[in-house]
């Protein structure tokens, strides 16, 4: 199924900011599609509408305009049911769904609160789960999930985030087998500069930042453009940088593979070689870095107690 910007009714979760808002803006500026942005906060949605095109109208309120918004807790299945009922009342048949909602609160597992961990499950998996369930039942033809490079390389500091992004990858694999006639794509973006990314860096442990490295965060608009190019090229596992592509090549697994992708043979070969030759050495280095960090941390705590 070809990816098209034009002629769609597009539902974007997390559409009030970050990458979701960038996609909404792209559809409004470069197509004739109707766009529905969804998030919890009506205030953020109205601000996003003003920034994108001078103002959006609330779904179900009547009036003209291609950009609509709907405030909804997507982690609540009943609320998602209400969203699709409102879409039906407005005469809108959603054709594409972009699952942009999500976010990370980096921190050590034992130091995160139960509320933070539960919020991670809802925000990064529950919202996509319920929205996808409704979308499949209501005839959407293209689902675009947003996972993360952390789904294929989870590491220290991302216990609230990475396991749920990995769960999304598993859900995508199942839906590709179950949903005949529905295109199911999954994006594994690297770092991009957004409100959520700035918030992440406030709580990110030093060891997490060290292992993650100093990769530059690209703009949301640039990230959006890369994803659109990948989808238009027919790729259903889309990355936005070389590191993400390499990580995915190392984690092909029992999953649908886009064998028409011209770099697929290289990815298969390179992934096998990296797994055999590079990963064992790299993981030893990571263990050493974590050991040093843990030792320094214990010494700091001991010195603080002594003082």
Curated annotation (Swiss-Prot):
Topology versus the membrane: Single-pass membrane protein
Entry annotation: catalytic residues: 147 (proton donor), 161 (proton acceptor), 165 (lowers pka of active site tyr)
Span of the annotated motif GXSXG: 14-18
Binding site for NADP(+): 11, 19, 161, 165, 194
Catalysis: reaction(s): sphinganine + NADP(+) = 3-oxosphinganine + NADPH + H(+)
Enzyme class, spelled out: oxidoreductase
InterPro entries in alphabetical order: KDSR-like (IPR045022), NAD(P)-bd_dom_sf (IPR036291), SDR_fam (IPR002347)
A GO cellular component entry from the record: lipid droplet
Gene Ontology molecular-function annotations: 3-dehydrosphinganine reductase activity; NADPH binding
PANTHER family: 3-KETODIHYDROSPHINGOSINE REDUCTASE
Protein name per the record: 3-ketodihydrosphingosine reductase TSC10
Gene encoding the protein: TSC10
